[in-house]
Amino acid sequence: MDIRTLSKKLKLSITTVSRALSGYSDVSAKTRTRVEKFAKKYKYSPNPYASRLASGKSNTVGFVLPLYGLNSNNLNQTSFFEFISGMTNTIHSENIQFFMMFANTAEEEKKAYEKLIYVQKVDKIILHNLKKKDSRIKMLKKNNVKFVTWGRTESLKNYSWVDLDNEGSINLIMKYLIEKNHNQIAYINIVENYNFAFQRQQGYLKSLKNFKIKYNKNYYLSVKNEEPEESAALIKNMLKNNPKITAIICSTEYSGVGAIKACNELNKKIGKDISVITFDGPVVQLLTTPALTAISHPRKELGSKAIEILLDMDKKNYTPKSYLAKPKIVERGTVNTLKKI
């Protein structure tokens, strides 16, 4: 059945039926309920293109996945697809469209966003890999495109976001390690121009201060986002020069794999001679023996929440919303308890 036939049965205009099925408030609740019951009875599913014409909106969510920089290795790409899985589950249940583009360079990424706005005419976008200052936010606001960010900039003014509690996660890890009598704790981060990396760095520094542990610059490592081999070489060198280190915190899953490689090359038994804890990824725990103890990162949940917030933006008097996922530690086999001295 098409919308024309359905509207005739209901004795309503096509526009009214379309807007009722889209949940617009200018159609009374009584009429919306009646239309929905008829649509269900006759198994009618709205044509998305017809809905666009009736509403004047594309009702499409755009997403750009860069395949360079932070996502240049397969581990991080897998993490993004878990977030996307959470997005698409909610998207499909709400009968809206999803358009994803890929970019191999920064220039391609810029053009991809321009294409989403000017060619595909999406009216909603999800941003990710937020920098401390991110020009994409200004661009989307200028073009009146609704958006939610996965992550935060250093300023939280006038936009909606979902994120993991990065500082809180590091504080939780530090507390966990200190309760197991570790105080020689190294931290492996990535370059801090990504705001989540900066937040985690701040969490590490604040935790050291709170737990009255003196900061040792030799215990902090900031690595570029490349393959795990690069971080492995740097971590190996750090451990050789600082033999008192008893635990390593890894800010990303690929550096966690690098830490394991470094420890193995130095014949350090993980979970006995040295402890390693990382931010969890959907595959990283399958790549290591013993399995990595990690901070759980609910990417699917964040993806779903991002879409829910985007949909709320169509309501009147919308104000920016945020969702901060609380961290939890998943204990596996890579952290040991030291004897108390």
Where are these regions (language model features)?
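Short, well-structured alpha-helical segments in soluble
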Residues: 109-121, 231-244
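Amphipathic helical "hinge" segments at domain boundaries
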Residues: 45-111
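Hinge/beta->alpha junction and helix N-cap segments in small-molecule ligand-binding domains
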Residues: 70-80, 100-108, 162-172, 188-234, ...
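Short acidic/polar active-site loop segments enriched in Thr and Asp
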Residues: 13, 59, 123, 183-184, ...
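Flexible loop/hinge segments that line or gate small-molecule binding clefts
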Residues: 128-168, 254, 280-292
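Flexible loop/turn connectors
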Residues: 232-341
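N-terminal helix-turn-helix DNA-binding module of bacterial transcription factors
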Residues: 1-59, 340
